[in-house]
Amino acid sequence: TRLVGSEMCIRDRATIDVEGTVKPEERAPHGFEIRLDKIKVLSEPAAPMPLAISKWKLNTSLEANLNNRAIALRNVRERAKFRIQEGVVRGFRDFLYSQGFTEIHTPKIGAKSAEGGANLFRLEYFHRPAVLQQSPQFYKQMMVGVFDRVFETAPVFRAEKHNTKRHLNEYTSLDFEMGYIDGFEDIMAMETGFLQYMIALLKKDYAEELRLLGVTLPNVDKIPTVRFCLLYTSPSP
């Protein structure tokens, strides 16, 4: 343990134990700083960091980021993305629990796809053909007869070649199914309620992460419903 003021060299990313007084500081990232009295080095890195993760942005190539992923994820902005992901899933779960839904967990390996189509990841399952599931749709429909309202948060897999940011081969799907509805408007109302709850939760509990990523969430008071008129034409004589 060294007293502050004595000569001491601390390497970047060393693990330290400090004693001091917490003081407000507007210029600090979290609004406060510690005025040190004592500091103790618990451990030092075995080698210099391959990335400057203490910077605001990594400013590295995608290849360098992925090759050093375990280290790159320690960057404050990289971490913030996973916190936002947590907030979205948390909001989905909390809202549906409040609406009387039951969470289910369905198989992801099956003999056939739940949605049909040919874009499947195929594999061998103990010498028998199988596929990775594209959707929990069949399982949700079965469980609605058990619990009336069910939801799942789980990965789905789609073997589709793409070149856009809006298509992924594997992603976390937020699915729900509900019985005893009068029409699709009931589904839209549930989705609107979730979006309102989730956005309010992110603004409240994940404000720092949103600030780090430069994200401004919209206000979702009411989502407009676009209706189409059905036109009837008499058959030609």
Question: Predicted regions: what is each one?
Answer:
Residues T1-G5, I10, Y232, P237:
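Single conserved hydrophobic/aromatic residue that forms the stacking wall/gate
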Residues A114-N119, G193-L230, S234-P235:
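Metal-assisted phosphate- and nucleotidyl-transfer catalytic regions
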Residues S6-E7, R11-I181:
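Class II aminoacyl-tRNA synthetase-like tRNA-binding/catalytic domains
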Residues G87, G91, M190-Y197:
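Long, highly charged amphipathic alpha-helices
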